[in-house]
């Protein structure tokens, strides 16, 4: 991605929501590499899909020769960003936030290159400059540059100020000053000239630009990526079970892979532009091929492979594909013990059974049928499989061979109703 037309290329991918002084920024990028940053507040113990677009945007800039700074908000995470939030956030303890800071720093690291010469990435934590700052310094040196009149007119907090039931605390109201100072301080420490973030961060980003100009007499820039929406109007990055997380212990590689496989045709080519590094020509060719093939589109599989491989590595992708193929074909012999544990983690119905339970009892306990009588009927009509093999003996008792890894048995009724038995 050549620097001189990087903004144009990002726009072609639909990755620019707003940008300050686009012409001046394009000119600055054409002059040579810059340092830029994106902030990630530790509001949970993992990043989720909503963080992926700005994180990949940092990577896109690094690939074009620029220096990315990944800022984890050890201080701002203790305060809470009120931007477009309907109610006050619950304050987390310092211990919890510190623990989350470490986890998020580790999560961000694989996406960037920290050892590639002059544009090696930097990891920063804003607690480093706020942790020792006293309140007088904060109010005199930072607060004097902010107009309350302007702050209360920012869209991000306006709705909270107009609500009688919630309002906004001074704690959250001051968040804007903290994030604004981050930009100024990162300019001071690392000559950072550009901040990127989600479109909900526009108000905080412009505050940082104003403060850096006042404190350092320097023009700096801001760029936001769009809030990702789906064609059907529903929220992106959520499943029935909640958010899709980047941490494998919160959303397994298999479930993550399935999330992308289930992308609607109306969204998939747009998502390839947002979430992969494939060339636009390649994406357009794939769309054309899918349109003319007369078969199911290939794009969802390409998207699932690209993003799962990027987030979970080759091993995570291999496990996700192995589980997908095994469940589809019914042949479970290639699945590992860890694969079965992933299914249990993902919310596949799982029951614990004692060793003497028979098939009828297992089906009832698994809520695949309401009664033993119904179980007999289902088994007799060849509608039940054990580990992918049809079982038509209504009086069947499980054998050791049915307990894969001495522990797991996968039951299926019909084509789609699964339950994992975890033998005790």
UniProtKB/Swiss-Prot annotation:
Keywords: Aminoacyl-tRNA synthetase, ATP-binding, Cytoplasm, Ligase, Nucleotide-binding, Protein biosynthesis, RNA-binding. InterPro entries: aa-tRNA-synth_I_CS, aa-tRNA-synth_Ic, Rossmann-like_a/b/a_fold, S4_RNA-bd, S4_RNA-bd_sf, SYY-like_C, Tyr-tRNA-ligase, Tyr-tRNA-ligase_bac-type. PANTHER family: TYROSINE--TRNA LIGASE, MITOCHONDRIAL, TYROSYL-TRNA SYNTHETASE. A motif ('HIGH' region) lies at residues 42-51. Belongs to the class-I aminoacyl-tRNA synthetase family. TyrS type 1 subfamily. CDD domains: S4, TyrRS_core. It is an enzyme of class 6 (ligase). This is Tyrosine--tRNA ligase. ATP binds at residue 238. A motif ('KMSKS' region) lies at residues 235-239. Pfam families: SYY_C-terminal, tRNA-synt_1b. SUPFAM superfamilies: Alpha-L RNA-binding motif, Nucleotidylyl transferase. GO terms for cellular component: cytosol. It catalyses: tRNA(Tyr) + L-tyrosine + ATP = L-tyrosyl-tRNA(Tyr) + AMP + diphosphate + H(+). The gene is tyrS. It is found in: Cytoplasm. Residues 357-414 form the S4 RNA-binding domain. L-tyrosine binds at residues 37, 175, 179. Its EC number is 6.1.1.1. Catalyzes the attachment of tyrosine to tRNA(Tyr) in a two-step reaction: tyrosine is first activated by ATP to form Tyr-AMP and then transferred to the acceptor end of tRNA(Tyr). GO terms for biological process: tyrosyl-tRNA aminoacylation. It comes from Serratia proteamaculans (strain 568). GO terms for molecular function: ATP binding; RNA binding; tyrosine-tRNA ligase activity. Homodimer.
